[in-house]
From Swiss-Prot:
Cofactor(s) recorded in Swiss-Prot or TrEMBL: FAD
Keyword Cytoplasm on entry: yes
Gene: mnmG
Main location: cytoplasm
The protein's name in its UniProt record: tRNA uridine 5-carboxymethylaminomethyl modification enzyme MnmG
Taxon lineage: Bacteria, Pseudomonadati, Pseudomonadota, Alphaproteobacteria, Hyphomicrobiales
SMART domains the UniProt entry points to: GIDA_assoc_3 (SM01228)
Binding-site residues for FAD, renumbered to this chain: 10-15
A GO cellular component entry from the record: cytosol
Source organism (scientific name): Bartonella quintana (strain Toulouse) (Rochalimaea quintana)
Positions bound to NAD(+): 269-283
Alphabetized UniProt keyword annotations: Cytoplasm, FAD, Flavoprotein, NAD, tRNA processing
UniProt similarity note: Belongs to the MnmG family.
């Protein structure tokens, strides 16, 4: 009999992080995948990070996960998105060499203690007394465990569509998990269908690069991981082109041949990553749509045309591509396709990502209705950690919305569910000033240390970093100027008689350590990385203090009970639609009311104010 503490099913981004987190927790862990050689495959675009997504990668790294380190090893075009905007919404991103990324992930897993890799297919769960106690494999039979983490990605009943052609597959060239999907239905799990897509892969040597504008990498690459000392790979350029009226005409003439518009596809696709057919149908008034030509590797002939996801027949794909500047003679290496797959309604999960109806079964990644490598990896880490802790008899880990984007995502999924693939954006976080990509380690690494999943090397580096920051902050807080002294140095402050520290002055627009060091030379000894952290911290200090108060108020308000006698129809300012929903659901607390679909912060504020006013009036009349 084969016995493990935790079994992970699936070797994509969620599965790899789940396996690593479980094993780092000390649990004897097995990772089951169709192909060990495919572990860590980037199934769609060759990039990691971006707006919102880059925050998740930094958080994964702060918890000692794999994705950030692998991206740094494989990164061939690092760019910090939104560089000109505030630090809270800046998004680190890199193009990655697919082969190098996969190689890095596989190396991490092969070197991980407490982890064994198994090449097989899961076809059923072992359930005893309504609790999951293992899996059944196609070749090796029963694997018993204390917990199971399902990270099936697009493989669960996956169907590929290209025009009128359809076949079962998890991704191009790999078969789907049909048996497991059928077995899940017998456990009365609420399943749905979603869809995603990918563009054709193009031959690099058949593209006319000379006529295209280029997008360069940042001169000073910003890595994802605290452990990365230097970006080693050479940095490459991407090219930019556009669709045109001729492209759009070909798509319109053949729209009936698209699997998406012929009625063959049932599942909804990601709103923020539409197919090119969707773009033309929904935004037909535009004369063109931007396409990024992204190399898939340093020594690879494959180009990923970001922005051209499609399920049109291959002949139509060739025709539309050759209307685009630079692609007049292009050859397709692999056609674009749409893929449909089963997902589980995430409202059936707890915030540990355990299925309520089947204790011992944890779900992570696209099976929970999300889209994207980063979203999957973050869920995988949390699910693997909680699976290991459940087996070890330890307290469960729930990450709050005010602590991390991971917490925002999980709360959104569990509380609100999904009607389309969920993608992370900074706009989803109420407290994004505190949840910056630059302070992910300060927010999460001490917690990860308590949970026992951080290496000694990372913990030492983190402590050294924080020590440098504490020392620099202390220096700045001990240096003062009066308003007259500030004016003498050309600094514009209010002449209110208040002495201001160097730390206070850093909150002023266009202020920097470099400028202050002209008359406070001791500031010149602060290293550049610490300078950046200190300047951001000081810039946000006042706002963060207010946000901390808001977080405390939210936590207090969430515990506020809603009287059963409360008539929501009497609360002015609430929409009639929301009044009807609330009255029907009858939430017992503000925390319950938050979970109602369509509930907004403004509406919550109206309800809280109304309840508090009623309480005051009742107290005054007593």
């Amino acid at each position: 009999m084969q016995l493990y503490d935790v079994v992970i099913i699936g070797g994509g981004h969620a599965g790899c992080e789940a396996a690593s987190a479980s094993a780092r927790s000390g649990a004897c862990t097995a990772l089951v995948t169709h192909k060990i050689s495919a572990l860590g495959t980037m199934s769609c675009n060759p990039a990691i990070g971006g707006l919102g997504k880059g925050h998740l990668v930094r958080e994964i790294d702060a918890l000692d996960g794999l994705m950030g380190r692998a991206a740094d090893i494989a990164g061939i075009q690092f760019r910090l998105l939104n560089r000109r905007k505030g630090p809270a919404v800046r998004g680190p991103r890199t193009q990655a060499d697919r082969k190098l990324y996969k190689k890095a992930i596989q190396k991490f897993l092969q070197e991980q203690d407490n982890l064994i890799l198994i090449e097989d297919e899961a076809v059923d769960l072992i359930v005893k007394d309504n609790c999951v106690s293992g899996v059944v494999l196609k070749k090796q039979g029963e694997l018993f465990s204390g917990a199971v983490v399902l990270t099936t990605g697009t493989f669960l009943n996956g169907l590929i569509h290209i025009g009128d052609k359809t076949w079962a597959a998890g991704r191009m060239g790999e078969h789907s998990s049909v048996q497991l999907a059928e077995r899940l239905k017998k456990y009365d799990i609420n399943l749905g269908r979603l869809k995603t897509g990918t563009p054709a892969r193009l031959s690099k040597k058949t593209i006319n690069w000379n006529c295209l504008s280029k997008q360069k990498a940042d001169e000073d690459p910003v890595p994802f991981s605290l452990l990365t000392e230097k970006i080693e790979q050479p940095q490459i350029e991407c090219a930019i082109t556009r669709t045109n009226t001729q492209t759009h005409q070909i798509i319109r003439e053949n729209i009936h041949r698209s699997a998406l518009y012929s009625g063959m596809i049932e599942g909804l696709g990601p709103r923020y990553c539409p197919s090119v057919e969707d773009k033309i149908v929904k935004f037909g008034e535009r004369d063109g749509h931007q396409i990024f030509l992204e190399p898939e590797g340093l020594n690879d002939d494959t180009i990923y045309p970001n922005g051209l996801s499609t399920s049109l027949p291959e002949d139509v794909q060739v025709a539309l591509l050759r209307t685009i500047e630079g692609l007049e003679s292009v050859k397709i290496l692999q056609p674009g396709y749409a893929i449909e797959y089963d997902f589980v309604n995430p409202q059936q999960l707890t915030k540990t990502l355990e299925l309520r109806s089947l204790p011992g079964l944890f779900l992570a990644g696209q099976i929970n209705g999300t889209t994207g490598y980063e979203e999957a990896a973050a869920q995988g880490l949390l699910a693997g950690l909680n699976a290991a802790r459940k087996v070890g008899g330890l307290n469960e880990i729930i990450i709050s919305r005010s602590t991390a984007y991971i917490g925002v995502m999980v709360d959104d999924l569990v509380s609100r569910g999904v009607s389309e693939p969920y993608r992370m954006f900074t706009s989803r976080a109420e407290f994004r000033l505190s949840l910056r990509s630059d302070n992910a380690d300060a927010r999460l690494t001490p917690l990860a240390q308590q949970w026992g999943i951080v290496s000694q090397k990372r913990w030492d580096l983190y402590q050294q970093k924080q020590q440098r920051l504490d020392q620099a902050r202390s220096i700045c807080q001990k240096l003062f100027l009066t308003p007259n002294q500030a004016s003498a140095h050309g600094l514009q402050v209010n002449h209110d008689g208040i002495r201001r520290s160097a730390y206070d002055l850093l909150a002023y627009p266009h202020m920097s350590i470099e400028r202050l060091s002209h008359f406070w030379q001791q500031l010149q000894s602060i290293d550049p990385k610490t300078v950046e952290s200190l300047e951001i911290e000081a810039q946000y200090a006042v706002y963060l203090e207010k946000q901390a108060q808001d977080i405390s108020a939210l936590q207090r308000d969430e515990r506020l009970e809603i009287p059963s006698s409360l008539d929501f129809q009497t609360i002015s300012g609430l929409s009639n639609e929301l009044k009807t929903k609330i009255q029907k659901i009858s939430p017992r607390s503000i925390a319950d009311a938050q979970k109602i679909d369509g509930m907004t912060p403004a509406a919550l504020s109206l309800i809280i104010t109304y309840i508090q006013r009623q309480r005051r009036e009742k107290a005054e009349s007593a």
